[in-house]
Amino acid sequence: RWVLIGAAPSVQSHVDRMKSNQDRVVIFPKIPFKDLPQHLSAADILVIPQRDTTDTQGQIPAKLFDAMSMAKPIITTPLSDIEEVLGGYGYLIDPSNPDQLAKTIEYIFANPEEARLKGLNARKRCQELYDIKVLKKELNLQIEKLATTNS
């Protein structure tokens, strides 16, 4: 079963046209942020599709860090610095290639141990590099450096 969170209303009309898929697709246009971990933890795979637009260039979606923290396999696109943030612990696809998305999902289900390890390593990477405590410490160090070089 597919669960789409944050899907545009137009997605529902596509699902409605595919009668055979209606029972297999659940759409939540928007959910409260506090409910997000519950939904993400129920997933087998987290997909974060980013299109290559002027809006997404240079942007790292916050949901990437949410996904990494859940220790689940992540499928996303190699736009901006997403590939660097994941550090090899995700599956990268061409944003304009739905067949590649389908094949990657099939691959993950055919290789569950690899997918599990990528998810766990993504979580570890997120904790070591992107946790708020780590970032706060690094920011304070940089501020101290600036303060001492300017005095």
Label every model-predicted segment.
Residues 38, 113-144:
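A charged, aromatic-enriched C-terminal amphipathic alpha-helix characteristic of glycosyltransferases
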Residues 12, 30-34, 61, 98, ...:
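Structural motif corresponding to alpha-helix initiation and N-cap regions
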Residues 91-98, 107-112:
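Conserved acidic donor-binding segment of nucleotide-sugar-dependent glycosyltransferases
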Residues 34-39, 46-68, 76-84:
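Nucleotide-sugar-dependent
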Residues 12-37:
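Nucleotide-activated donor-binding/catalytic signature segment of Leloir-type glycosyltransferases, i.e.
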Residues 1-14:
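Glycosyltransferase donor-sugar binding loop
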